[in-house]
Amino acid sequence: MPNWNFLFDMLKIQSVSGDEESVSKFILESINQRKKNWIVTPEIYSGEKFHDCILLKFGNPTTAVFAHMDTIGFMVRYDNQLIPIGGPEIIPDVKLTGRDKFGEIRCSLLGDEEGIFHDFPRGIERGTRLSFEQNIRMDSEFIQAAYLDNRLGIFTALELCETLENCWVVFSTYEEHGGGSMPFLLKFIQETGPVKNALISDITWITDGVHHHEGVVISIRDKFIPRKKFLDRIINLAQKSGIPFQLEVEAHGGSDGREVQFSPYAIDWCFIGAPEDNVHTPDEKVSLKDLDSMIQMYQYLMKEL
C-alpha cells in the first residue's frame, strides 16, 4: 500500500531550486525510519559534502535511478518584482507562499510574461523564494496538487527501495533551473560503485499522443536523444512485463538525463515517468493508474536490468 501520508507531507514542503535543504532532511528522516523494512540496507551518502543531495547504494549496482528534489517557483527581486525559477506558468492572481526573516508570506502574483510582481503589503527580503500555494486533492482516479513534478518521482524511488538488491537511488538538486548537481553525483557514483545505466524517475506531460490512464511513459526522446540500443532493451522488457505503458516522442523538454548524456561517462539513460496535465501550475494532475504503473515498472525493470 503506497505511503500516501508521506507523499502529502512532502508536497507541503517548499524546495524551490537551490533551496532543497528542508525536503532533503525530510526524505533522509523517512529513509532512516523505513530502511529496516527493506530487503537490503543501503549505504547512505548525504550531508554538506553532497550539497543536500542523497545517494543510496544497494548491493553491487549496475543501474542508478535519479529523482530530483527541487521545484519551480519565483524569486523576489527589487521592490515588488518577481523572477521565475525554472519555468512556472504565469497565472495572474495565483497565490504564492514563502518566508523571509520578517515572517510568513502569502500574496498574489500580478502581471504577465512581460513582467511579474507580488502584492504583499510590505517589502519582501531580496532573494526570497516563493512557491505556488499548495492544495492537494485526490479521488479514486487522480491526484492533483502543485509540485507533483517531481514529488511523484521521489515517491516512486522510495517505494522502489523496499525491493531493491543492487542499485543506486539518487535524489538530486537544481534540475528545474538547468541542473548542476549531476556532474559531481555521477563522478562520485563512478568512483564508488560504477554503473552502466541510468533511469530518470520524473514526471512528463499529457500531449496529443500521451493520455491519462494509459500507463507510465517511456520517453524515446525529448530535446535529447538516448541511445536506441538501450531504449530497445527497456521497451522490450516493458512489453514482457504486461504493465501498461506509453511511448513518448517530443522535440522539447529535458531532465537529469541531459546531464548523464553530456557527462564524460558511458552511461545509457532513459526517462520513465507518469504523465501530468496542467504542467508547472498549482493544479498538476496525474492518474493514479499511471502512478501505479510507474511504480510497478521501476520494480520490474530493476529486477531485469
For each feature predicted by the language model, list its residue ranges:
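N-terminal hydrophobic/helix-forming segments and targeting peptides
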Residues: M1-L305
